[in-house]
Amino acid sequence: MSTMSARDNEKGSARSQPSHAAASEIENVPRPSRQQSWTGTMIKVFIICACAGIVSKYIIPLDSIFKSVHIDPHDYATRANRILSTTPLIDGHNDLPYLIRLETKNKIYDHEKLPFRTGLLSHTDQIKIQEGKLGGQFWSVFVECATDPNAEIDDPTWAVRDTLEQIDVTKRLVQEYPDLLEYCESASCAKAAFKRGKVGSFLGIEGGHQIGNSLASLRQVYDLGVRYITVTHNCDNAFATAASTVAVGKPDLGLTDFGREFVKEMNRLGMLVDLSHVSHQTMRDILSVTKAPVMFSHSSSYALSKHLRNVPDDVLNGVTKNGGVVMVTFVPSFLKVDDPASATIHDAVDHILHVAKVAGWDHVGIGSDFDGTADVPEGLENVSKYPRLIELLLERGVTDEQARKLIGENILRVWSNVEEIAENIRALGEKPNEETWSGRKWTAAIDIPMPFMFKDSADKRKEL
Protein backbone atom coordinates (compact mmCIF):
# COMPACT_ATOMS: atom_id res chain seq x y z
CA MET A 1 0.00 0.00 0.00
CA SER A 2 1.39 3.44 -0.92
CA THR A 3 1.56 6.35 1.62
CA MET A 4 1.20 10.13 1.20
CA SER A 5 2.66 13.02 3.21
CA ALA A 6 0.35 15.43 5.07
CA ARG A 7 1.23 18.15 2.54
CA ASP A 8 0.37 15.88 -0.35
CA ASN A 9 -2.82 14.95 1.42
CA GLU A 10 -3.79 18.58 1.85
CA LYS A 11 -3.00 19.39 -1.75
CA GLY A 12 -4.95 16.39 -2.84
CA SER A 13 -7.89 17.39 -0.66
CA ALA A 14 -7.81 20.95 -1.93
CA ARG A 15 -7.71 19.84 -5.53
CA SER A 16 -10.48 17.36 -4.99
CA GLN A 17 -13.00 19.78 -3.39
CA PRO A 18 -15.32 21.46 -5.93
CA SER A 19 -16.83 24.87 -5.25
CA HIS A 20 -20.40 25.03 -4.01
CA ALA A 21 -21.50 26.33 -7.39
CA ALA A 22 -19.71 23.59 -9.23
CA ALA A 23 -21.11 21.01 -6.85
CA SER A 24 -24.57 22.37 -7.42
CA GLU A 25 -24.11 22.17 -11.18
CA ILE A 26 -22.92 18.59 -10.87
CA GLU A 27 -25.91 17.67 -8.76
CA ASN A 28 -28.22 19.21 -11.39
CA VAL A 29 -26.76 17.17 -14.26
CA PRO A 30 -29.34 14.49 -15.12
CA ARG A 31 -28.06 11.00 -14.36
CA PRO A 32 -28.75 8.19 -16.86
CA SER A 33 -31.60 5.89 -16.01
CA ARG A 34 -31.05 2.16 -15.48
CA GLN A 35 -32.53 1.55 -18.93
CA GLN A 36 -30.11 4.03 -20.50
CA SER A 37 -27.16 2.41 -18.67
CA TRP A 38 -28.28 -1.02 -19.84
CA THR A 39 -28.62 0.20 -23.43
CA GLY A 40 -25.17 1.76 -23.35
CA THR A 41 -23.65 -1.39 -21.94
CA MET A 42 -25.28 -3.51 -24.62
CA ILE A 43 -24.01 -1.18 -27.35
CA LYS A 44 -20.48 -1.58 -25.98
CA VAL A 45 -20.88 -5.37 -25.86
CA PHE A 46 -22.17 -5.35 -29.44
CA ILE A 47 -19.19 -3.31 -30.62
CA ILE A 48 -16.76 -5.63 -28.82
CA CYS A 49 -18.41 -8.71 -30.32
CA ALA A 50 -18.42 -7.18 -33.77
CA CYS A 51 -14.73 -6.40 -33.46
CA ALA A 52 -14.07 -9.93 -32.24
CA GLY A 53 -15.92 -11.29 -35.26
CA ILE A 54 -13.79 -9.19 -37.57
CA VAL A 55 -10.65 -10.40 -35.83
CA SER A 56 -11.67 -14.05 -36.04
CA LYS A 57 -12.64 -13.71 -39.67
CA TYR A 58 -9.79 -11.64 -40.97
CA ILE A 59 -6.92 -11.90 -38.50
CA ILE A 60 -6.95 -15.35 -36.89
CA PRO A 61 -6.71 -17.35 -40.16
CA LEU A 62 -3.05 -16.44 -40.56
CA ASP A 63 -2.62 -19.18 -43.13
CA SER A 64 -5.02 -17.30 -45.41
CA ILE A 65 -2.94 -14.15 -45.04
CA PHE A 66 0.25 -16.12 -45.61
CA LYS A 67 -1.19 -17.66 -48.77
CA SER A 68 -2.08 -14.23 -50.15
CA VAL A 69 1.32 -12.59 -49.54
CA HIS A 70 2.99 -11.84 -52.85
CA ILE A 71 6.09 -13.90 -53.54
CA ASP A 72 8.33 -13.79 -56.56
CA PRO A 73 7.06 -16.75 -58.65
CA HIS A 74 10.67 -17.72 -59.36
CA ASP A 75 11.50 -17.89 -55.64
CA TYR A 76 10.68 -21.59 -55.52
CA ALA A 77 12.11 -22.21 -52.06
CA THR A 78 9.90 -19.55 -50.48
CA ARG A 79 6.87 -20.78 -52.39
CA ALA A 80 7.53 -24.33 -51.25
CA ASN A 81 7.92 -23.19 -47.65
CA ARG A 82 4.63 -21.31 -47.79
CA ILE A 83 2.82 -24.33 -49.25
CA LEU A 84 4.22 -26.71 -46.64
CA SER A 85 3.48 -24.25 -43.82
CA THR A 86 -0.19 -23.87 -44.72
CA THR A 87 -1.14 -27.30 -46.12
CA PRO A 88 -0.22 -30.59 -44.42
CA LEU A 89 2.10 -32.86 -46.37
CA ILE A 90 0.63 -36.28 -45.66
CA ASP A 91 2.82 -39.24 -46.58
CA GLY A 92 0.95 -42.43 -47.41
CA HIS A 93 3.52 -44.93 -46.15
CA ASN A 94 6.41 -45.07 -43.67
CA ASP A 95 7.86 -48.25 -42.15
CA LEU A 96 9.61 -46.84 -39.07
CA PRO A 97 7.54 -49.04 -36.71
CA TYR A 98 8.93 -52.15 -38.42
CA LEU A 99 12.52 -50.95 -37.90
CA ILE A 100 11.70 -50.45 -34.23
CA ARG A 101 10.42 -54.03 -34.10
CA LEU A 102 13.53 -55.42 -35.78
CA GLU A 103 16.13 -53.44 -33.85
CA THR A 104 14.68 -52.80 -30.38
CA LYS A 105 12.02 -55.52 -30.09
CA ASN A 106 9.50 -52.68 -29.72
CA LYS A 107 11.19 -51.09 -26.71
CA ILE A 108 11.00 -47.32 -27.17
CA TYR A 109 11.38 -45.68 -23.75
CA ASP A 110 15.18 -45.76 -23.49
CA HIS A 111 15.97 -42.63 -25.49
CA GLU A 112 19.67 -43.41 -25.56
CA LYS A 113 19.04 -46.70 -27.33
CA LEU A 114 16.34 -45.15 -29.54
CA PRO A 115 17.42 -41.51 -30.01
CA PHE A 116 14.32 -40.50 -31.97
CA ARG A 117 14.67 -36.84 -30.95
CA THR A 118 18.37 -36.41 -31.64
CA GLY A 119 18.78 -38.51 -34.76
CA LEU A 120 18.65 -42.02 -36.22
CA LEU A 121 20.71 -43.39 -39.11
CA SER A 122 17.51 -44.39 -40.90
CA HIS A 123 15.12 -42.12 -42.80
CA THR A 124 12.85 -40.82 -40.04
CA ASP A 125 13.36 -39.04 -36.72
CA GLN A 126 12.21 -35.81 -35.07
CA ILE A 127 14.91 -33.62 -36.62
CA LYS A 128 14.24 -34.91 -40.14
CA ILE A 129 10.48 -34.65 -39.67
CA GLN A 130 10.75 -31.00 -38.65
CA GLU A 131 13.22 -30.12 -41.40
CA GLY A 132 11.00 -31.83 -43.96
CA LYS A 133 7.87 -30.07 -42.68
CA LEU A 134 5.95 -33.33 -42.55
CA GLY A 135 2.30 -32.61 -41.75
CA GLY A 136 0.80 -36.09 -41.38
CA GLN A 137 1.90 -39.71 -41.66
CA PHE A 138 0.28 -43.07 -42.29
CA TRP A 139 2.55 -45.33 -40.23
CA SER A 140 2.66 -48.89 -41.58
CA VAL A 141 2.10 -51.53 -38.90
CA PHE A 142 3.63 -54.09 -41.25
CA VAL A 143 4.57 -57.69 -40.55
CA GLU A 144 5.88 -59.98 -43.27
CA CYS A 145 4.17 -62.78 -45.17
CA ALA A 146 4.89 -66.39 -44.21
CA THR A 147 8.51 -67.28 -44.93
CA ASP A 148 7.58 -70.68 -46.36
CA PRO A 149 6.68 -70.12 -50.04
CA ASN A 150 4.60 -73.32 -49.96
CA ALA A 151 2.53 -72.25 -46.97
CA GLU A 152 -1.23 -72.53 -47.40
CA ILE A 153 -3.38 -69.45 -46.97
CA ASP A 154 -5.09 -70.86 -43.88
CA ASP A 155 -1.97 -72.27 -42.22
CA PRO A 156 -1.60 -70.86 -38.69
CA THR A 157 0.90 -68.03 -38.30
CA TRP A 158 1.78 -65.35 -35.77
CA ALA A 159 0.80 -62.56 -38.18
CA VAL A 160 -2.28 -61.38 -36.29
CA ARG A 161 -0.43 -61.33 -32.94
CA ASP A 162 2.51 -59.50 -34.49
CA THR A 163 0.18 -56.98 -36.12
CA LEU A 164 -1.39 -56.21 -32.75
CA GLU A 165 2.10 -55.64 -31.37
CA GLN A 166 2.85 -53.20 -34.20
CA ILE A 167 -0.36 -51.30 -33.57
CA ASP A 168 0.62 -51.12 -29.91
CA VAL A 169 4.18 -49.87 -30.46
CA THR A 170 3.08 -47.26 -33.00
CA LYS A 171 0.47 -45.85 -30.65
CA ARG A 172 2.99 -45.81 -27.81
CA LEU A 173 5.54 -44.03 -30.01
CA VAL A 174 3.01 -41.30 -30.76
CA GLN A 175 2.15 -40.98 -27.07
CA GLU A 176 5.84 -40.73 -26.14
CA TYR A 177 6.33 -37.61 -28.29
CA PRO A 178 3.13 -35.57 -27.80
CA ASP A 179 4.84 -32.28 -28.65
CA LEU A 180 5.52 -33.61 -32.17
CA LEU A 181 2.97 -36.32 -32.97
CA GLU A 182 -0.80 -36.60 -32.54
CA TYR A 183 -2.74 -39.84 -32.95
CA CYS A 184 -5.73 -39.56 -35.30
CA GLU A 185 -8.45 -41.83 -36.66
CA SER A 186 -10.25 -39.39 -38.97
CA ALA A 187 -9.56 -36.87 -41.71
CA SER A 188 -10.92 -34.05 -39.57
CA CYS A 189 -8.47 -34.93 -36.80
CA ALA A 190 -5.61 -34.90 -39.32
CA LYS A 191 -6.51 -31.34 -40.31
CA ALA A 192 -6.93 -30.20 -36.71
CA ALA A 193 -3.61 -31.74 -35.65
CA PHE A 194 -1.80 -29.81 -38.37
CA LYS A 195 -3.39 -26.55 -37.21
CA ARG A 196 -2.09 -27.33 -33.72
CA GLY A 197 1.42 -27.76 -35.10
CA LYS A 198 1.43 -31.55 -34.71
CA VAL A 199 2.13 -34.36 -37.18
CA GLY A 200 -1.11 -36.32 -37.45
CA SER A 201 -0.31 -40.02 -37.06
CA PHE A 202 -2.51 -42.71 -38.60
CA LEU A 203 -2.31 -46.51 -38.87
CA GLY A 204 -2.19 -48.64 -42.01
CA ILE A 205 -1.89 -52.43 -42.34
CA GLU A 206 0.20 -53.75 -45.23
CA GLY A 207 -1.47 -56.95 -46.37
CA GLY A 208 -4.60 -59.01 -45.78
CA HIS A 209 -2.46 -61.82 -44.32
CA GLN A 210 -2.05 -59.58 -41.26
CA ILE A 211 -5.71 -59.99 -40.34
CA GLY A 212 -5.73 -63.76 -40.90
CA ASN A 213 -7.89 -63.40 -44.03
CA SER A 214 -10.86 -62.73 -41.73
CA LEU A 215 -13.60 -60.11 -41.91
CA ALA A 216 -14.08 -60.40 -38.15
CA SER A 217 -10.42 -59.50 -37.69
CA LEU A 218 -10.90 -56.64 -40.14
CA ARG A 219 -13.57 -55.16 -37.91
CA GLN A 220 -11.41 -55.53 -34.83
CA VAL A 221 -8.39 -53.74 -36.28
CA TYR A 222 -10.70 -50.97 -37.48
CA ASP A 223 -11.87 -50.57 -33.88
CA LEU A 224 -8.20 -50.38 -32.87
CA GLY A 225 -7.72 -47.39 -35.17
CA VAL A 226 -6.39 -48.87 -38.43
CA ARG A 227 -7.64 -46.75 -41.32
CA TYR A 228 -6.27 -48.48 -44.39
CA ILE A 229 -5.38 -52.02 -45.37
CA THR A 230 -3.21 -52.90 -48.35
CA VAL A 231 -5.18 -55.77 -49.89
CA THR A 232 -2.06 -57.91 -50.40
CA HIS A 233 1.61 -57.62 -49.62
CA ASN A 234 4.14 -59.82 -51.44
CA CYS A 235 1.98 -62.93 -51.18
CA ASP A 236 -1.44 -64.01 -52.36
CA ASN A 237 -4.14 -64.32 -49.74
CA ALA A 238 -7.80 -65.23 -49.54
CA PHE A 239 -8.72 -61.88 -51.05
CA ALA A 240 -6.57 -61.39 -54.14
CA THR A 241 -3.49 -61.97 -56.28
CA ALA A 242 -0.32 -60.02 -55.42
CA ALA A 243 1.95 -58.31 -57.94
CA SER A 244 4.86 -60.40 -56.69
CA THR A 245 3.02 -63.57 -57.71
CA VAL A 246 2.66 -62.38 -61.30
CA ALA A 247 6.31 -61.29 -61.30
CA VAL A 248 7.44 -64.91 -60.92
CA GLY A 249 5.28 -66.09 -63.81
CA LYS A 250 2.15 -67.26 -62.04
CA PRO A 251 -1.32 -66.32 -63.36
CA ASP A 252 -2.99 -63.06 -62.42
CA LEU A 253 -6.32 -64.27 -61.02
CA GLY A 254 -7.29 -60.88 -59.65
CA LEU A 255 -9.83 -60.42 -56.87
CA THR A 256 -11.48 -63.53 -55.41
CA ASP A 257 -15.17 -63.81 -54.59
CA PHE A 258 -14.24 -63.49 -50.93
CA GLY A 259 -12.13 -60.47 -51.84
CA ARG A 260 -15.28 -58.80 -53.10
CA GLU A 261 -16.85 -59.34 -49.70
CA PHE A 262 -13.70 -57.91 -48.13
CA VAL A 263 -13.94 -54.71 -50.17
CA LYS A 264 -17.64 -54.45 -49.41
CA GLU A 265 -16.98 -54.68 -45.67
CA MET A 266 -14.17 -52.13 -45.86
CA ASN A 267 -16.58 -49.75 -47.59
CA ARG A 268 -19.14 -50.29 -44.81
CA LEU A 269 -16.59 -49.63 -42.09
CA GLY A 270 -15.01 -46.57 -43.68
CA MET A 271 -11.63 -48.23 -44.21
CA LEU A 272 -9.46 -47.00 -47.08
CA VAL A 273 -8.83 -49.79 -49.62
CA ASP A 274 -5.13 -49.68 -50.55
CA LEU A 275 -4.18 -51.14 -53.95
CA SER A 276 -0.39 -50.93 -53.67
CA HIS A 277 1.23 -54.38 -53.94
CA VAL A 278 -1.75 -55.99 -55.69
CA SER A 279 -1.64 -57.36 -59.25
CA HIS A 280 -2.86 -55.28 -62.17
CA GLN A 281 -5.98 -57.41 -62.57
CA THR A 282 -6.71 -57.06 -58.87
CA MET A 283 -6.50 -53.28 -59.29
CA ARG A 284 -9.05 -53.37 -62.10
CA ASP A 285 -11.35 -55.77 -60.25
CA ILE A 286 -11.40 -53.66 -57.09
CA LEU A 287 -12.12 -50.49 -59.05
CA SER A 288 -15.11 -52.28 -60.59
CA VAL A 289 -16.68 -53.27 -57.26
CA THR A 290 -15.78 -50.65 -54.65
CA LYS A 291 -18.39 -48.11 -53.60
CA ALA A 292 -15.78 -45.72 -52.23
CA PRO A 293 -12.61 -44.04 -53.53
CA VAL A 294 -9.44 -46.13 -53.31
CA MET A 295 -5.84 -45.27 -52.56
CA PHE A 296 -2.42 -46.48 -53.65
CA SER A 297 -0.35 -45.77 -50.54
CA HIS A 298 3.04 -46.21 -52.23
CA SER A 299 3.16 -46.92 -55.98
CA SER A 300 4.45 -45.18 -59.11
CA SER A 301 3.79 -45.11 -62.86
CA TYR A 302 4.01 -48.31 -64.90
CA ALA A 303 4.25 -46.31 -68.14
CA LEU A 304 7.55 -44.80 -66.96
CA SER A 305 8.95 -47.90 -65.25
CA LYS A 306 7.67 -51.38 -66.12
CA HIS A 307 7.66 -52.73 -62.59
CA LEU A 308 4.54 -54.73 -61.70
CA ARG A 309 4.24 -52.79 -58.43
CA ASN A 310 3.46 -49.69 -60.46
CA VAL A 311 0.12 -48.48 -61.82
CA PRO A 312 -0.77 -48.80 -65.54
CA ASP A 313 -2.36 -45.86 -67.33
CA ASP A 314 -5.73 -47.59 -67.77
CA VAL A 315 -5.86 -48.05 -63.99
CA LEU A 316 -4.92 -44.39 -63.52
CA ASN A 317 -7.93 -43.51 -65.67
CA GLY A 318 -10.01 -45.79 -63.48
CA VAL A 319 -8.78 -43.98 -60.38
CA THR A 320 -9.96 -40.71 -61.90
CA LYS A 321 -13.48 -42.09 -62.35
CA ASN A 322 -13.37 -43.63 -58.89
CA GLY A 323 -12.24 -40.41 -57.21
CA GLY A 324 -9.23 -42.04 -55.56
CA VAL A 325 -5.56 -41.12 -55.21
CA VAL A 326 -2.22 -42.61 -56.28
CA MET A 327 0.54 -41.70 -53.82
CA VAL A 328 3.85 -41.82 -55.67
CA THR A 329 6.65 -43.75 -53.98
CA PHE A 330 10.41 -43.16 -53.99
CA VAL A 331 11.65 -46.77 -54.18
CA PRO A 332 14.47 -46.68 -56.78
CA SER A 333 13.51 -49.96 -58.48
CA PHE A 334 9.99 -48.63 -58.98
CA LEU A 335 11.21 -45.30 -60.35
CA LYS A 336 13.78 -46.83 -62.73
CA VAL A 337 13.34 -50.57 -63.04
CA ASP A 338 16.15 -50.89 -65.60
CA ASP A 339 18.72 -48.94 -63.58
CA PRO A 340 17.63 -48.39 -59.96
CA ALA A 341 21.06 -47.21 -58.82
CA SER A 342 20.79 -44.15 -61.05
CA ALA A 343 17.38 -43.05 -59.71
CA THR A 344 17.22 -39.46 -58.45
CA ILE A 345 14.71 -37.01 -57.08
CA HIS A 346 14.06 -35.92 -60.68
CA ASP A 347 12.68 -39.37 -61.47
CA ALA A 348 10.22 -39.02 -58.60
CA VAL A 349 9.16 -35.67 -60.07
CA ASP A 350 8.65 -37.33 -63.46
CA HIS A 351 6.40 -40.00 -61.95
CA ILE A 352 4.34 -37.43 -60.07
CA LEU A 353 3.87 -35.38 -63.23
CA HIS A 354 2.88 -38.45 -65.26
CA VAL A 355 0.27 -39.57 -62.73
CA ALA A 356 -1.09 -36.01 -62.64
CA LYS A 357 -1.16 -35.83 -66.44
CA VAL A 358 -3.11 -39.08 -66.84
CA ALA A 359 -5.27 -39.17 -63.70
CA GLY A 360 -5.45 -35.42 -62.99
CA TRP A 361 -4.10 -33.25 -60.22
CA ASP A 362 -6.99 -34.28 -57.97
CA HIS A 363 -5.71 -37.86 -57.90
CA VAL A 364 -2.01 -37.78 -57.06
CA GLY A 365 -0.21 -37.81 -53.71
CA ILE A 366 3.06 -38.76 -51.99
CA GLY A 367 3.78 -42.17 -50.44
CA SER A 368 7.53 -42.33 -49.88
CA ASP A 369 8.01 -45.81 -48.33
CA PHE A 370 10.78 -44.26 -46.22
CA ASP A 371 12.30 -46.79 -43.82
CA GLY A 372 10.78 -49.57 -45.92
CA THR A 373 13.53 -49.58 -48.54
CA ALA A 374 17.28 -49.78 -48.00
CA ASP A 375 18.01 -47.78 -51.14
CA VAL A 376 16.68 -44.31 -51.86
CA PRO A 377 17.04 -41.97 -54.84
CA GLU A 378 19.72 -39.30 -54.85
CA GLY A 379 18.15 -36.15 -53.45
CA LEU A 380 15.48 -38.03 -51.49
CA GLU A 381 17.69 -39.53 -48.81
CA ASN A 382 15.22 -39.11 -45.96
CA VAL A 383 12.12 -37.33 -44.66
CA SER A 384 13.90 -33.96 -44.54
CA LYS A 385 13.95 -33.74 -48.35
CA TYR A 386 10.26 -33.03 -49.00
CA PRO A 387 10.79 -29.26 -49.44
CA ARG A 388 13.31 -29.84 -52.22
CA LEU A 389 10.84 -32.16 -53.98
CA ILE A 390 8.19 -29.44 -53.92
CA GLU A 391 10.70 -26.85 -55.16
CA LEU A 392 11.56 -28.99 -58.17
CA LEU A 393 7.90 -29.49 -58.98
CA LEU A 394 7.35 -25.73 -58.88
CA GLU A 395 10.34 -25.26 -61.16
CA ARG A 396 8.68 -27.66 -63.60
CA GLY A 397 5.60 -25.42 -63.77
CA VAL A 398 3.40 -26.90 -61.05
CA THR A 399 1.13 -24.26 -59.51
CA ASP A 400 0.78 -23.68 -55.78
CA GLU A 401 -2.79 -25.00 -55.95
CA GLN A 402 -1.66 -28.20 -57.66
CA ALA A 403 1.13 -28.66 -55.14
CA ARG A 404 -1.35 -28.33 -52.26
CA LYS A 405 -3.53 -31.04 -53.77
CA LEU A 406 -0.52 -33.29 -54.20
CA ILE A 407 0.88 -33.01 -50.70
CA GLY A 408 -2.31 -33.37 -48.68
CA GLU A 409 -5.60 -32.05 -49.98
CA ASN A 410 -6.25 -35.06 -52.21
CA ILE A 411 -5.73 -37.78 -49.62
CA LEU A 412 -7.76 -35.80 -47.07
CA ARG A 413 -10.62 -35.49 -49.58
CA VAL A 414 -10.50 -39.21 -50.38
CA TRP A 415 -10.42 -40.12 -46.69
CA SER A 416 -13.37 -37.82 -45.92
CA ASN A 417 -15.36 -39.30 -48.82
CA VAL A 418 -14.69 -42.84 -47.60
CA GLU A 419 -15.95 -41.86 -44.14
CA GLU A 420 -19.08 -40.23 -45.57
CA ILE A 421 -19.93 -43.20 -47.81
CA ALA A 422 -19.54 -45.56 -44.85
CA GLU A 423 -21.94 -43.46 -42.79
CA ASN A 424 -24.50 -43.62 -45.61
CA ILE A 425 -24.11 -47.40 -45.97
CA ARG A 426 -24.58 -47.96 -42.24
CA ALA A 427 -27.53 -45.56 -42.17
CA LEU A 428 -29.30 -47.92 -44.58
CA GLY A 429 -29.00 -50.66 -41.96
CA GLU A 430 -26.32 -52.82 -43.57
CA LYS A 431 -25.01 -55.24 -40.97
CA PRO A 432 -21.45 -56.56 -40.56
CA ASN A 433 -20.50 -59.08 -43.24
CA GLU A 434 -20.44 -62.65 -41.86
CA GLU A 435 -18.87 -64.33 -44.90
CA THR A 436 -15.75 -66.46 -44.45
CA TRP A 437 -13.23 -67.80 -46.95
CA SER A 438 -14.35 -71.03 -48.61
CA GLY A 439 -11.07 -72.74 -47.72
CA ARG A 440 -11.32 -71.86 -44.05
CA LYS A 441 -10.51 -74.71 -41.66
CA TRP A 442 -12.64 -74.61 -38.54
CA THR A 443 -11.42 -76.50 -35.52
CA ALA A 444 -13.25 -77.87 -32.51
CA ALA A 445 -12.17 -79.76 -29.41
CA ILE A 446 -14.77 -82.48 -29.93
CA ASP A 447 -13.40 -84.60 -27.09
CA ILE A 448 -14.57 -82.02 -24.55
CA PRO A 449 -18.13 -82.73 -23.42
CA MET A 450 -20.30 -79.80 -24.47
CA PRO A 451 -24.06 -79.50 -24.92
CA PHE A 452 -25.60 -79.38 -28.39
CA MET A 453 -27.74 -76.48 -29.59
CA PHE A 454 -29.35 -78.45 -32.45
CA LYS A 455 -30.35 -82.07 -33.12
CA ASP A 456 -27.86 -82.63 -35.93
CA SER A 457 -24.95 -80.86 -34.23
CA ALA A 458 -23.08 -84.08 -33.43
CA ASP A 459 -22.45 -84.79 -37.10
CA LYS A 460 -21.70 -81.14 -37.87
CA ARG A 461 -19.06 -80.96 -35.18
CA LYS A 462 -17.29 -83.95 -36.66
CA GLU A 463 -17.13 -82.14 -39.99
CA LEU A 464 -15.32 -79.13 -38.55
Swiss-Prot record:
Pfam families: Peptidase_M19
GO cellular component: membrane
Cofactor or coenzyme needed: Zn(2+)
Catalytic activity: an L-aminoacyl-L-amino acid + H2O = 2 an L-alpha-amino acid
Subcellular location: Membrane
Role this protein plays: Hydrolyzes a wide range of dipeptides.
Biological process terms in GO annotation: proteolysis
Principal location listed in the UniProt entry: membrane
Region of interest called Disordered, as start-end residue ranges on this chain: 1-34
UniProt xrefs under Gene3D superfamilies: Metal-dependent hydrolases
Species of origin: Coccidioides posadasii (strain C735)
Protein name per its UniProtKB record: Putative dipeptidase CPC735_014430
Keywords in alphabetical order: Dipeptidase, Disulfide bond, Glycoprotein, Hydrolase, Membrane, Metal-binding, Metalloprotease, Protease, Transmembrane, Transmembrane helix, Zinc
Glycan attachment positions: 382
GO molecular function, one term: metallodipeptidase activity
Annotated residues for binding of Zn(2+) 1: 93, 95, 206
Family of this protein: Belongs to the metallo-dependent hydrolases superfamily. Peptidase M19 family.
